[in-house]
Amino acid sequence: DLYKRQVISDYTVTEKMIKHFIQKALGKKSFRKPLVSVCVPSGVTEVEKKAVEDATFAAGARDVKIIEEPIAAAIGAGIDISKPCGNMIVDIGGGTSDIAVISLGGSVVSTSIKIAGDDFDEAIVRYMRKKHNLLIGERTAEDIKIKIGTCYPLAQPETIEVRGRNLVTGLPRTITVSSEETEEALREATLQIVEAVHSVLEKTPPELAADVADRGIVLTGGGSLLRGLEELIEEKTGINTMTAEQPMTCVAIGTGKYVEFLAGKRDEEF
């Protein structure tokens, strides 16, 4: 696979993919070498960053700028990261969740955990197998998550009909699943994200922690769309929590705007 848990594992294929996108953006006949910004999880090592850089240069880049996911997410969410105040971003992707407190254009405290949106689907699959002896696929689990999934009690519980294979008889079976059951299924994964948020807050300098308390926590990434996540984090931390306007595209938009941010920073220095 090209990606394992949203981290690049095949650099030869990565190089070819980046080359394809460069040609698509500039045209095959273009002789210009572009400046490319590449986003990576905050937990990657310097060796992994260097490997990404090398693959991007080999694909035809003139220069490469590496940006950590929380920084990209913050820029994409419309946060001015150049200010000396603290902003907290929780970016929940498919394979990793990146949590960071950002100030003066960089991460002050950050962590990356391999618990994210894909784990929500897997948790529902496991729950259905254990609780109902029902085998369902990840696509069905995702459908359950989107339609009635929650990690916080709903004012009005919801239900959905789920079809799968009975593990006892081997025959098709349809059951009714409630939103309360998804809350139970997702509890462990979502609480691990909350614990990571706690951990970052505990390591944050007092002045920046006070800024976060005033400004709130911003959620980005597809995983942030899980119902109840705002309420759960807010309840456990006591800090106002909100989801960015377009959470699924924040990282992509921020990665694109990062070069502009660096150019503005250089202008300020001169």
Question: Would you name each region that the model predicts?
Answer:
Residues 1-92, 100-218, 224-270:
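Nucleotide/phosphate-binding catalytic cleft detector across ATP-hydrolyzing
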